[in-house]
Each structure stands twice: as C-alpha cells, then as structure tokens.
Amino acid sequence: MSGPALRQVEPHRAIHAAMRHELQATVMAAETLSPDGDQARRLRQVVEVFLELVETRILAHAHEEEAGLYAEWLQLQIQGGREALSAAVASLVLQHSMLRQLAADVERATVVGKREAVLRGMREFQRVLDDHERHEEDLVRELLEIGGG
C-alpha cells in the first residue's frame, strides 16, 4: 500500500514540487558552468548531485507509486470497469521508464565527458518529469472527485 500522501492531491503535489525545485536548481547550476578547468570538475559534481537526487528521491518515488498507488488504481479499474484508468496507469509507468532511461543517458554522457549531451539529458529529464507530474496530479484529482481514490 502507498502512503496516504500519494492518494491526496495537495500532499502529492507538494512532494512533486519539492523534487521539481531541487531538480531545477541542479539543472540551472549545471547550465552556468563552462566546460573548462575547475568548472568542468564542478560540473561533474553538480551532475553527481543531480543523479543522486534522481535515484534517491525521484525514481524512488516512482517505484513507490508503481508498487502502491498505481496498483491500487488498477484494482479500482478491475472493480469498476474503468478501462481508461488502465491506459492512464500504463502511460504513467511508461513515463517512469523514460525517466529511468534519461537518467542512465545522463550518467553515460558524464562518464565519457560529453557536456552538451549531459545538459540536454538533464533538461529532457526535467521536461518529461514536468509532463508526468501534471498528468498524474490530474488523475489523482479525477479519482478523488469520483470517490475512487
């Protein structure tokens, strides 16, 4: 079972907002650093912070959603015959998979020293996460409105 905060619009939105704020700060920090000298070393450090945030907060949260919240939603779909809910959950899980792949891409680009690929991957991660959060929060709100969440 997922925690109660995941099944409520405002607490879930607050979790997302905190993660989004941290992510945005690391992306902005990375974008300000040049590829030269000490700043290249600093960029690697910022990317390490980014990847740690992604692994320990964002992807851990995604796992919790998949194991708890989404499983509950699929059970609602089975009980209530809501086929659209199954498609919505599949879409959210696909977005989680995209986030995992983007994180791996950023890590690989960091290892080989491709600064622009790192920055592009970080920005794309941020974009996919923003889209995902909006979609998910809308679904939480919808389920609460119909009394199913």
Each PLM stretch: what is its role?
Residues 1-149:
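Small-residue-biased structural context
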